């Protein structure tokens, strides 16, 4: 009997378009001799829409539903995704997707799901909290200042100017895919950057700008996590912003990255240590800065990285000999393994 995968995609965050691309890729890559795929679209308003089911390879004309093509007659209660024995693959990015909220919902439904649990998802989604946890694990971070809504902004800007040097990068703490991130060269630009970042979150991170290569490591596993050789993001723009990342295709990837064996070893070890520090499960992508001074800074952990067939995470594993369809199978198996362990702990 075939295993059912429930594919959740879309979502309420600014990254919903990325989610659709990832879900389409998964839907086309699945081994339909082993799996049946049922898809549910989460609209921008948070409604669940029952969309297509696939028991064999979809045709080129098959497209997943989006906000532009919603059939509201197919709206269902969120709990309608439940199917005994099915595994949920929440291909959701950003807030209300990989921040622990959907993971908590799926645990209430008592369904296995791909990826990190409530704790590790919510922790990794918040950049400030992640930095504090990784600091406690002894992992080097880019110098930063945290600013929370209600803080004296003028005093915080003074702290930034005391501890850091321009240029600095300002980021919403709880957002991904470079949404709301700005580079500032002076105080006036920093004030504008803070205003933008606070539109997306009530907690904001200001980081020291560094001249660095962006190196990424893939992680796969539960308590026996394994890492990939690193890959490098090669950019044609000033920084890896949302448009460059997903719309303009102004980036290329160098896999494996051209760095020394010693640097590779440190990055892989730090990535695995970070994954364990947050209690990660299933998958993550760990992003590093490798500065022109030879410093290695862990930038962030993405618990549901971009998952199209041309995204960095699947390509990193392809370089390690695990194909995209096989990667999906492994993630489903890991989801069932972590579900069984979680259920056993409740007895």
Swiss-Prot record:
PROSITE patterns: ATP_GRASP, DALA_DALA_LIGASE_1, DALA_DALA_LIGASE_2
GO cellular component: cytosol
EC number(s) recorded for this UniProt protein: 6.3.2.4
One GO BP: peptidoglycan biosynthetic process
Alphabetic keyword roster: ATP-binding, Cell shape, Cell wall biogenesis/degradation, Cytoplasm, Ligase, Magnesium, Manganese, Metal-binding, Nucleotide-binding, Peptidoglycan synthesis
Residues bound to ATP: 161-216
Reactions performed catalytically: 2 D-alanine + ATP = D-alanyl-D-alanine + ADP + phosphate + H(+)
Binding site for Mg(2+) 1: 287, 300
Pfam families: Dala_Dala_lig_C, Dala_Dala_lig_N
NCBIfam families the record matches: D_ala_D_alaTIGR, PRK01966.1-4, PRK01966.1-5
Protein name as annotated: D-alanine--D-alanine ligase
Organism name: Streptococcus pneumoniae (strain CGSP14)
Lineage: Bacteria, Bacillati, Bacillota, Bacilli, Lactobacillales
Gene: ddl
């Amino acid at each position: 009997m075939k295993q059912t995968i429930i594919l959740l995609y879309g979502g309420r965050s600014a990254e919903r378009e990325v989610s659709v691309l990832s879900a389409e890729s998964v839907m086309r890559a699945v081994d339909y001799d082993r799996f049946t795929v049922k898809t549910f679209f989460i609209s921008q308003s948070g409604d669940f829409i029952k969309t297509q089911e696939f028991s064999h390879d979809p045709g080129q004309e098959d497209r997943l539903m989006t906000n532009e093509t919603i059939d509201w007659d197919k709206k269902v209660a969120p709990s309608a995704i439940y199917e005994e024995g099915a595994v949920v693959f929440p291909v959701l990015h950003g807030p209300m997707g990989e921040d622990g909220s959907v993971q908590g919902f799926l645990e209430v439904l008592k369904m296995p799901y791909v990826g990190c649990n409530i704790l590790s998802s919510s922790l990794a989604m918040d950049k400030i909290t992640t930095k504090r946890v990784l600091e406690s694990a002894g992992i080097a971070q880019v110098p930063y200042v945290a600013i929370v809504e209600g803080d004296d902004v003028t005093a915080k800007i003074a702290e930034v100017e005391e501890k850091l040097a321009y240029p600095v990068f300002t980021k919403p703490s709880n957002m991904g895919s470079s949404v709301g991130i700005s580079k500032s060269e002076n105080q006036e630009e920093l004030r504008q950057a803070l205003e933008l970042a606070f539109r997306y979150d009530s907690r904001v991170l200001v980081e020291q700008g560094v001249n660095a290569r962006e190196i990424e490591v893939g992680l796969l596993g539960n308590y026996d996590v394994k890492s990939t050789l690193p890959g490098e993001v090669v950019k044609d723009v000033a920084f890896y912003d949302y448009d460059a990342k997903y719309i303009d295709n102004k980036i290329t990837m160098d896999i494996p990255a051209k760095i020394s064996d010693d640097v590779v070893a440190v990055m892989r070890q730090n990535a695995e240590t970070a994954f364990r520090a947050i209690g990660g499960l299933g998958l993550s992508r760990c992003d590093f800065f490798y500065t022109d001074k030879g410093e290695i800074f862990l930038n962030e952990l993405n618990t549901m990285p971009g998952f199209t067939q041309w995204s960095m995470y699947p390509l990193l594993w392809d370089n390690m000999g695990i194909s995209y369809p096989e990667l999906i199978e492994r993630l489903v198996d890991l989801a069932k393994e972590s579900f069984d362990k979680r259920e056993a702990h409740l007895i």
